[in-house]
Amino acid sequence: MKKIISIILFSLALFQTCGRIYAQDETFGKTSLRPKLKFEARLDYNNDNKNDDLSGIKGYIVDLKLEGDLSPRFSYKYRQRLNKPVKDATFFDATDWLYLTYKAHRNISLMAGKWIVAVGGWETEPAPIDIYQISEFCNNYSCYQWGFNVIFNTTNNQNQVYLQICESPFRKQYKASTGNGKEMWAYNALWIGNIDFFHAFYSANMMEYRPGKYLNFIALGNRFDLGRKVALDFDLQNRASRASDFFKDYTLSAQITYRPLPAFQCFAKISHDRNNTGNGSDPTVFDGTKLTRLGGGVEFFPLKNDNLRLHGHYSYSWGRNTNPDGVLRDGQSIVNVGLTWRMHILK
């Protein structure tokens, strides 16, 4: 009940603020109401020495993206995965985004709907169709949830702050393990900042992993532009359900990307997941896990844009994963090559 009252009061305060702002700033000029519609698909050949079911030629992702404006103040975005199985008898399990944004002021927006959970780190930033290698944490984390966002944007567009209330990404895992579909929430604050060659993707998060029990995150995503052709990412994510857990449950990841030509890019990446808390509160990286993944790949863009992409990637994992249903395994070797194409149906 306290959570419900807090959410209602928070919403009322936002709408009251919006009313005042709207009275001060009534127009943003003309806008086009023509929607944009894009079709995306990726076809892969995968060879996984630890999982034969994932080996072979596979359709990896097919999705549709729709976005546009309803007015100068209202905009929408929608992305539906056509290949993702629908679970729990709901169409929206295959929906990544479905949200409406209200631009209350040049520097303040409100968003409601399904969107990514506001956790920092550049590893979580790419769309699934653009991902080749992720950590064990990301493999066990439901990153798209229903919720509400308040977005503050600086006038120079170099900094954004997101305040978010959404459903906990651990709700389905709790239901699967206990059989109880309880209401569970996450409270997130995210800062995206651009300071010359440095780009920050930082967050602080409180997420219920059981009703009334919170797993707290500090996620620090750092990107450095090393000239025009090289970028270096370094992410640190610490998870703790109590103060004594600090830096006992964490994920580190780093990636370097080199793009010497518009049509060619290569990268190398490493991640390390570890949980030594002994309390079993983290549903993503189980207690006793100590796991490293190293890999690299190349991308070729024959059309010199992202409408057509060829890729090749290899990764190797080693260590201990105590999650019996985990994704990464000791001695796991994965080879992946594939083709991605994007079609602009409406521009």
Specify the residue positions occupied by each region the protein language model found.
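Outer-membrane beta-barrel pore domains
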Residues: 34, 40-52, 88, 99, ...
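Aromatic-acidic/polar surface patches that form glycan- and anion
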Residues: 55-57, 93, 139, 180, ...
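Exposed loop/turn and edge beta-strand positions of beta-sandwich/beta-sheet ligand-binding modules
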Residues: 60, 94, 106, 144, ...
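Short, well-structured alpha-helical patches and their helix-loop capping segments
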Residues: 135-142, 179-183, 271
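Bacterial Sec-dependent N-terminal signal peptides
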Residues: 1-26
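Loop-centered beta-sheet repeat module
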Residues: 162-213
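Short glycine-rich loop/turn motifs
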Residues: 147, 186-188, 219
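Outer membrane beta-barrel
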Residues: 25-45, 53-170, 193-194
